[in-house]
Swiss-Prot record:
Family: Belongs to the DEAD box helicase family. DDX23/PRP28 subfamily.
Its biological purpose: ATP-dependent RNA helicase involved in mRNA splicing. May destabilize the U1/5'-splice site duplex to permit an effective competition for the 5'-splice site by the U6 snRNA, resulting in the switch between U1 and U6 at the 5'-splice site. May also act to unwind the U4/U6 base-pairing interaction in the U4/U6/U5 snRNP, facilitating the first covalent step of splicing.
Disulfide bonding pattern of the chain: none
Enzyme class label: hydrolase
Organism name: Aspergillus fumigatus (strain ATCC MYA-4609 / CBS 101355 / FGSC A1100 / Af293) (Neosartorya fumigata)
Example of a GO MF term: mRNA binding
Descriptive protein name: Pre-mRNA-splicing ATP-dependent RNA helicase prp28
GO cellular component, one term: catalytic step 2 spliceosome
Family matches, as InterPro entries: DEAD/DEAH_box_helicase_dom (IPR011545), Helicase_ATP-bd (IPR014001), Helicase_C-like (IPR001650), P-loop_NTPase (IPR027417), RNA-helicase_DEAD-box_CS (IPR000629), RNA_helicase_DEAD_Q_motif (IPR014014)
Length: 796
């Protein structure tokens, strides 16, 4: 500064002498060589040769530029705006252009990047002083006490170049503050692939998704882990933090002791029959009685009469109230109080199902049937206490002049269900014996039955009602001469009961005409078709007059329209509905109502079915002897066989056991058949041995046991066989001997036993191979029946 002032020109540079060189410490001597090392060569003391003369002269030494704060700097000129914009555009254009990198360059960049990451990770791993201590083992300066002015002073640790390559974390004055930044997180491990980190994360996500799917598939097929302690059924303990526990009881409430509103209830007194809403019938009865007493006290004569009327009105109101009617059973209600729900329950109780237009409701009792009083008296005299399900449903429909198809199990009272409407129909017609020409025009009604025995049985049942009413009933069956039957028809007959074959013979011989027939009943229609009577049935129905045939329109479902004109009425009863029966029904019936009791083809629920696997005639005879001698079953008993030549043999065996027996098959004459049935019905014979001839329609009262010595060829025949017992609501037992030759019906038999609530399927039948699936060839006949004595021919 003194030199600058003395020269008088403070801006001129002043040349100062160079500073004296600092004395460096002497270099330590080199370490002594090892013994095994070779000695160094001696120093070269020779003088170097002079430079050659032809060498060019050395350039003059370049003048050393002054470096430092005193050096002259060029004047900085500011950049113009145009220059800045141009540079910016050039930089953007260069950045927008794709930069090509060769494979070697990409590998080099990746290796350098990987090397830096490895080096950073190694430094972070080898640095043990991240908890506040420096590398020399001393405590970090950040833990020293603060200075009085609030700053933390750090002790210098040497030049920056000698601080073990520490990364600066900010200005030196703020480097040891408490709000210093935390060290950066360690970098993620990367593979030596040439792809970027996005590919690795995508691959990792795909692997995680695949692992999750594999876990779900394993859980689906292997189930949940058994070590899991979770249980859906385990009761969870509820928290009690929201449950308020009262510290007093309801008995401690003293508000009712001193408040008169709680001590006595206010009663609103109404003079009249009015009352407050919301009270039960007991309160209404009390108010009505109170009002009646008030009327009696006011006026002894007129008031007492009025009081009785009010009490009677209240009683009727209580009985007819909706709430009371809903609580009552249908048997306790009046007919006008029956609702749709009650009728539905009623049909379910009796297993009744109806379809076919507007079908009337069933009748609950004989009094509600709509029959004339004279017929109701006859019903009571005959002994019909309660109507059967088919009678409950069929009689109201038939009384409306509707065509009817009744599908019901055997022994369900079908005879009375069509006889009673028939008698009502013909009772409104003129008497047939009034004029001679009316006798010759034929009957008013015909009843077709498949067998002679069934026809005669229907005749016996019909005479119980026709004789008191003055109607004539004639049966036309085989086994009797035409002259005898013609003599029976000399005075005419309102009702003719016949088999199809004999009735066709009478029509062809001109013994009978159907000019005024207006009521047709086909009983056991499926059995008639099964016996080959389809063609005779068609001939009979085609011989009927067409003048009174119903129209095949919706008017056939209108009961009022049918009653206004005397149309022909057709009824068909069957236990099953094969295709041939359906074909006849579609051809000759007009918009029929269909009534089904139970299910078509089912056995009666009152019959207990037992099946025993017994092979061989001798074993079966021995088992039959044990059953008859057990005393469990009282006569009469029916034993069914498949072929007629076995009937006499089984009957002889039964007689040797000490029981009386008769036979019934196709080789018997009509007189022999009638005598056999009469002996069984009057109790003079214990056992009836028969073929399928007696399987349908034969009503022997109080049959306690049916034995199928040979299993029937079809499940339908089996159903009608066992239907000979358990009739009219009574219970019965059916025992069947089964063998391997009955494989065709084992499956259907097992299904029928499973549907029966009181029957059991034996293990031999349940596990039999033929009972596992339905045979493909259908209901084929067995080879035993192909010897000329067929079960469905006239040779039974």
């Amino acid at each position: 500064m003194d030199g600058i002032i003395s020269n008088g020109s403070p801006g001129a540079p002043v040349t100062q002498p160079p500073p004296e060189p600092l004395e460096r410490p002497p270099t330590p001597p080199p370490p002594p060589p090892e013994d095994s090392a070779a000695p160094p060569p001696p120093p070269d003391t020779s003088v170097p040769p002079p430079p050659p003369e032809d060498a060019p002269p050395a350039p003059p030494p370049e003048k050393k530029k002054k470096v430092g704060w005193g050096a002259k700097r060029p004047a900085a000129t500011p950049l113009s705006v145009e220059e800045l914009v141009r540079k910016k555009r050039e930089a953007d254009a260069a950045a927008a252009k794709p930069k090509f990198l060769s494979k070697a360059e990409r590998e080099r960049i990746a290796l350098e990047k990987r090397a830096k990451e490895v080096e950073a990770g190694r430094r972070l791993k080898l640095d043990p002083f991240t908890d506040g201590t420096d590398r020399s083992g001393t405590q970090s300066p950040s833990v020293y006490p603060e200075t009085p002015n609030g700053d933390e002073r750090s002790i210098p640790t040497g030049p920056r170049a000698m601080r073990n390559s520490e990364v600066p974390t900010g200005p030196a004055a703020m480097r040891n503050k408490t709000y210093d930044m935390s060290p950066p997180p360690p970098p993620k491990a990367m593979s030596f692939s040439l792809t970027d980190g996005k590919g690795d994360s995508k691959r990792q996500a795909e692997e995680d998704e695949a692992a999750a799917q594999a876990a779900l598939i394993k859980q689906k097929y292997m189930g949940t882990e058994k070590t899991s302690s979770f249980s859906a059924k385990k009761k969870r303990k509820r928290t009690t933090d929201r449950k308020f526990n009262f510290e007093w009881n309801a008995e401690e409430d003293t508000s009712g002791d001193y408040n008169p509103l709680y001590q006595q209830r206010h009663e609103a007194n109404f003079y009249g029959r009015g009352r407050l809403a919301g009270f039960g019938d007991d309160v209404a009865d009390t108010l009505a009685q109170k009002y009646a007493r008030a009327l009696e006290d006011r006026d002894r004569e007129a008031g007492s009469i009025r009081a009785r009327e009010i009490l009677e009105m209240e009683r009727r109101r209580r009985e007819e109230s909706t709430r009371n009617q809903l609580d009552k059973h249908w048997s306790e209600k009046k007919l006008e109080h029956m609702r749709e729900r009650d009728w539905r329950i009623f049909k379910e109780d009796f297993n009744i199902s109806t379809k076919g237009g507007s079908v009337p409701n069933p009748m609950r009792s004989w009094e509600e049937s709509g029959l004339p009083k004279r017929l109701l008296e006859l019903v009571d005299q005959v002994g019909y206490k309660e109507p059967t399900p088919i009678q409950r449903a069929a009689i109201p429909i038939a009384l409306q002049s509707r065509d009817l198809i009744g599908v019901a199990v055997t022994g369900s009272g079908k005879t009375a269900s069509f006889l009673l409407p028939l008698l009502v129909y013909i009772s409104e017609l003129p008497r047939i014996d009034e004029f001679e020409w009316r006798k010759n025009d034929g009957p008013y009604a015909i009843v077709l039955a498949p067998t002679r025995e069934l026809a005669q049985q229907i005749e016996i049942e019909a005479r119980k009602f026709t004789q008191p009413l003055g109607f004539n009933v004639v049966s036309i069956v085989g086994g009797h001469s035409f002259e005898e039957q013609a003599y029976s028809l000399r005075n005419g007959a309102e009702i003719i009961i016949a088999t199809p074959g004999r009735l066709v013979d009478c029509i062809e011989r001109r013994l009978l005409v159907l000019s005024q027939c207006c009521y047709v009943i086909m009983d056991e229609a499926d059995r008639m078709i099964d016996l080959g009577f389809e063609e005779p049935v068609n001939k009979i129905l085609d011989a009927l007059p067409v003048t009174n045939e119903k129209p095949d329109t919706e008017e056939a479902e209108n009961s009022a329209a049918m009653r206004s004109h005397r149309y022909r009425q057709t009824m068909m009863y069957t236990a099953t509905m094969p295709s041939a029966v359906e074909r006849i029904a579609r051809k000759y019936l007009r918009r029929p109502a269909i009534v089904t009791i139970g299910s078509a083809g089912e056995a009666v629920d009152t019959v207990e079915q037992r099946v025993e696997m017994i092979a061989g005639e001798d074993k079966r005879k021995k088992r039959l002897a044990d059953i008859l001698s057990s005393g469990e079953f009282r006569p009469p008993i029916i034993v069914f066989v498949n072929i007629k030549r076995n009937c006499d043999a089984i009957a002889r065996e039964i007689k040797q056991m000490g029981f009386s027996s008769v036979t019934l098959h196709g080789s018997k004459t009509q007189e022999q058949r009638e005598a056999a049935l009469a002996s069984v019905r009057n109790g003079s014979t214990d056992v009836l041995v028969a073929t399928d001839l007696a399987g349908r329609g034969i009503d022997v009262p109080d049959v306690s046991l049916v034995v199928n010595f040979n299993m029937a060829n079809s499940i339908e025949s089996y159903t009608h066989r066992i239907g000979r017992t358990g009739r009219a609501g009574k219970s019965g037992v059916a025992i069947t001997f089964l063998g391997n030759e009955d494989a065709d019906v084992m499956y259907d038999l097992k299904q029928m036993l499973m549907k029966s609530p009181i029957s059991r399927v034996p293990e031999e039948l349940r596990k039999h191979e033929a009972a596992q699936s339905k045979p493909n060839r259908g209901l084929a006949k067995k080879s035993d029946d192909s010897s000329g004595f067929g079960t469905k021919s006239g040779w039974q």
